[in-house]
UniProtKB/Swiss-Prot annotation:
Pfam family, one: Glyco_hydro_19
Name of the protein in its database record: Endochitinase 1
Source organism of the structure: Capsicum chinense
Known role: Defense against chitin-containing fungal pathogens.
Family of this protein: Belongs to the glycosyl hydrolase 19 family. Chitinase class I subfamily.
């Protein structure tokens, strides 16, 4: 659906070195899954 490309995501993530790498599960907390309510409209 071309919301953003894989390469654009990787480039943006590299701008934030702590993205997905900082803290442990106690600090980050549980994964938040809310079905597709937040992301579904992005692909339309």
């Amino acid at each position: 659906n071309n919301f953003y490309s894989y390469n654009a995501f990787i480039t943006a993530a590299k701008s934030f070195p702590g993205f997905g790498t900082t803290g442990d599960t106690a600090v980050r907390g549980p994964i938040q899954i809310s079905y597709n309510y937040n992301y579904g409209p992005c692909g339309r």
